């Protein structure tokens, strides 16, 4: 979302400073010092530090049960977002995704000006008539009942419709014309490790995605289904013992859009192991929840060899996780090309 907003503002001549979570494909970096008056920054709620920011415009895309090791409960996480949404000045704007129930729940306690976006007819900025066309997505934008026009983005998935709607809402608040917004979104070429196509070899396409939360995984797999009519093989490396424990039940239901799931050991990310929190338990649970083709490979160094026994011409392999699972995708491409 942040990178789309920054791209649209840059296209509109605002030359913003940008600090984004992932590297923009167009820049090869995740930060750029601009000469304009705006800074577009990706806020991090994981440790509560986002409450140290003083935004003029804030965008809240979703609130999922994440980082509960820091907050202790969902109620405390929601309270932090209530504070964040109301930190804007009187002339500012909070932009909220109306379709996300936890974000929607902020509205009764909003003390400052806000705008909404989503598929809901009640959203200020609404997407209608969504069409998926390979790696492109088209939809019509409605603003408070008035048709603004058609948008095309060069990436699949409903989550990217939401991301672009957020960018449209921000740019509209800054009085940017719809045609300029449309051109800016059409020029957006994506972010590294966000549905990044790594290459194709032997008729097998490899995509890498940073998604490590169940909702992110579902969104990525759904986007793959929208973009290609192929067998989908998801290669997932769980990230953090605490996240695996806290969202265990949600992970079990996150992979139904994949034909085959390959799991490897948990990427600790500096955490100490938690007793009885194991990737093997995820493997067993996903099978018990009805998935027909699940594999567990504890040693990630052996993933590529196992994948070579699984993949067929025409398959789509997606590496998923915030750790180093992307290396398995790159090695698979090398092996398929005969380089290793």
Describe these PLM feature segments.
Residues 93-98, 234-237, 258-268:
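Short internal beta-strands
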């Amino acid at each position: 979302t942040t990178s789309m907003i920054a791209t649209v503002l840059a296209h509109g001549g605002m030359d913003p400073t940008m600090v984004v979570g992932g590297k923009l494909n167009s820049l090869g970096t995740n930060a750029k010092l601009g000469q304009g008056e705006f800074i577009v920054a990706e806020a991090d709620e994981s440790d509560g530090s986002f409450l140290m920011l003083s935004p003029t415009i804030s965008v809240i895309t979703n609130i999922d049960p994440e980082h509960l090791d820091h907050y202790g409960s969902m109620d405390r996480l929601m309270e932090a977002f209530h504070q964040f949404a109301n930190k804007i000045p009187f002339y500012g704007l909070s932009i909220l995704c109306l379709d996300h129930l936890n974000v929607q729940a902020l509205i009764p306690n909003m003390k400052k000006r806000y705008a909404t976006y989503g598929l809901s007819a009640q959203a200020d900025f609404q997407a209608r008539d969504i069409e998926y066309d390979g790696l492109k997505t088209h939809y019509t934008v409605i603003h408070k009942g008035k048709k603004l026009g058609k948008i095309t983005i060069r990436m699949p998935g409903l989550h990217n419709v939401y991301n672009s709607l957020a960018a449209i809402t921000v740019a509209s608040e800054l009085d940017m014309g719809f045609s300029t917004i449309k051109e800016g979104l059409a020029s957006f070429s994506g972010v590294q490790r966000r549905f990044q196509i790594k290459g194709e070899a032997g008729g097998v396409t490899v995509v890498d995605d940073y998604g490590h939360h169940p909702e992110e995984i579902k969104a990525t797999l759904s986007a793959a289904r929208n973009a290609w009519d192929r067998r989908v093989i998801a290669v997932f490396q769980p990230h953090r013992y605490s996240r695996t424990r806290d969202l265990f039940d949600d992970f079990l239901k996150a992979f139904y859009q994949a034909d085959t799931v390959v799991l490897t050991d948990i990427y600790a990310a500096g955490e100490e192991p938690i007793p009885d929190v194991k990737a093997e338990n995820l493997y067993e649970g996903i099978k018990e929840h009805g998935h027909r083709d699940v594999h567990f490979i504890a040693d990630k160094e052996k993933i590529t060899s196992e994948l070579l026994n699984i993949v067929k011409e025409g398959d789509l392999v997606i590496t998923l996780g915030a750790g180093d699972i992307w290396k398995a995708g790159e090695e698979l491409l090398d092996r398929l090309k005969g380089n290793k």
